[in-house]
Amino acid sequence: MALKLAYLLVGGCGGCDMAVVDLSEKLVDALEHLEIVFWAPTVADVKYKDLEAMPDQSIDLGLISGMVRNKENEHLVKVMRQKCKIIVAFGICAALGGIPGMANMHKNEELFENAYIKSPSTDNPNNVIPQPVSKEGEFELTLPEFLDRVKPIDEVIEVDYYVGGCPPHHDHVAKVVEAVITGNLPPKGSWITNGKAVCDVCARNPAVKGKTREFVKEVKRMHEGIPDEEECLLNQGYLCLGPVTQGDCGALCPKVNIRCAGCGGPIPPTRDFGLRAISALGSILADENVTDQLIKKYPVLTKILYRYSLPGAMINKKLFK
């Protein structure tokens, strides 16, 4: 009997949906074992009420991508939890908040002001800010109410498994689907990952060439020159987060001469990506002068170390208690 699958996108961009579609013929093969009963709002012509009408626990597997940003997102993930036996936080936004989680460094009022009033491309002479309720003649229009901060979905519901990536690489998605179909899943609460760091699968890794990693003697930003395509980006001074990031992507960014920014999420059992990253960087900076360079070139280091994981960070949860 085919496993029933539901896919829900909440506060995200749809890239994780496309990662599933990118399975191409592998997705066709998987459909011999899976019955997709719901996929919204991107792929199937269904309504949220269709999900709400399904019997509780009637769906074997629910994939949720995107973070929780408003009350509609919050309601829908609760409905998914009610209807699905297994929930997977699919992609880094669902797992840890993702890039939209950077909004947690600002108040909602500041975000709205910058988006709708101060933006150089916005024509809004009356300084109108969207409201949850607006009346147009005899009609009352509503928008989902913003929450005070971005949340990963496990702050709203219990999550069974996590998958990193922005989006997850389609090869890894295929392995996730296979694990689900065969029932070869890790313990509940685990990340579904190969357990390797980006550095472990990166051809630039000095260890692969029989060399040792050097201390970083200079900190560079990506626009400061063109990195040597053969040498480790960290050894060249670029702030690559490969040592602390799950490598299920196959080191795609270093392959095209771009530093790893950490979208794969932390390597288990690490709980806080940013803390692990600063610990790793601190161990390879050559001296205090290099540390000063780091602080000068990255004055808001939080935006680098927590680019994909701020809502799931320990410090974020402490601040919002």
From Swiss-Prot:
tRNA-binding listed as a keyword: no
Keyword field: Cytoplasm, Oxidoreductase
Enzyme class (EC, first level): oxidoreductase
Gene3D superfamilies (alphabetical): NADH:ubiquinone oxidoreductase-like, 20kDa subunit (3.40.50.700)
InterPro entries: Hydrogenase_assoc-protein, NADH_UbQ_OxRdtase-like_20kDa, NiFe_Hase_small_N_sf
Principal place of residence: cytoplasm
Entry-linked SUPFAM superfamilies: HydA/Nqo6-like (SSF56770)
Top-level taxon of origin: Archaea
Example of a GO MF term: oxidoreductase activity
GO CC, alphabetical: cytoplasm
The keyword Thylakoid is assigned to this record: no
Pfam families in the cross-refs: Oxidored_q6
Subcellular location: Cytoplasm
The protein's Enzyme Commission number: 1.12.99.-
Function: Part of a complex that provides reducing equivalents for heterodisulfide reductase.
Family of this protein: Belongs to the [NiFe]/[NiFeSe] hydrogenase small subunit family.
Assembly description: The F420-non-reducing hydrogenase is composed of three subunits; MvhA, MvhD and MvhG. It forms a complex with the heterodisulfide reductase (Hdr).
UniProt name for this protein: F420-non-reducing hydrogenase iron-sulfur subunit G
Taxonomic source organism: Archaeoglobus profundus (strain DSM 5631 / JCM 9629 / NBRC 100127 / Av18)
